[in-house]
Amino acid sequence: MVTKEDLIAFEDDIANLFNGGKIKAPVHLSSGNEDHTIKAFENIKSNDWVCGAWRNHFMCLLKGVPKEDLKRRILNGKSMVMCIPEHRIICSSIVGGIPSIATGIAWAEKLKSEGNHVWCFVGDMSAATGAFSEAWRYSIVHNLPITWIIEDNGKSVETPTREMWGFRHPAATFDYIYEQSDGIVWDTPNKMIYYRYTNNKFPHAGAGMRVQF
């Protein structure tokens, strides 16, 4: 069983390796969302698919990827494009790139009728894109076996999501399903899980030191 302490220790290890010049490619590190991610994974089965973006180390560990295997892949420059089909993990480093892929996988699972589910992790800014909106609505209309997990840290890189989009009313964002501060919301009818978190430990990319590849 992977614990919160395991997740934190892994990212700290990767941060030290990156700052030491051992990783010759970008990394995106997580912090502050350990409890929420662990909670979401309580419902994810081994045969389910997990789809995500470039910040994916937590979900890989919780899906069962061995720590040393994941570390090897990161050292080989694969942090942003973690596709491990044997563990049913698919990631995309393109903003808004994963929703359509996840939707396609969900269609395939529905046709196979084997009871498997797709869980797609996206950030709040990605969830504000047309690509997400189309895939999310499509999955509801066709009742696909997929759940969208929106991880809201309030920004894209350093751009505040709500400011950037000019949101003035809570219904214009996912605030309308947010019921408690620093909580996690399960919106089953809309195939959605939503939570907020703050990452004050790591920058958007890298680990806080300028590293020349």
Question: Language-model features: where?
Answer:
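Phenylalanine-focused residue identity feature
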Residues: F10, F18, F41, F58, ...
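Cofactor-/ligand-binding subdomain signature composed of acidic, glycine-rich
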Residues: M1-P26
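A short alpha-helix capping/helix-coil boundary motif
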Residues: T3-K4, L17-F18, S113-N116, W148
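Cofactor-binding active-site loop characterized by glycine-rich and histidine/acidic residues
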Residues: A15, K22-H142, E163-F167
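Thiamine diphosphate
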Residues: H142-F213
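Alpha-helical protein-protein interaction elements
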Residues: V2, D124, G130, Y178, ...
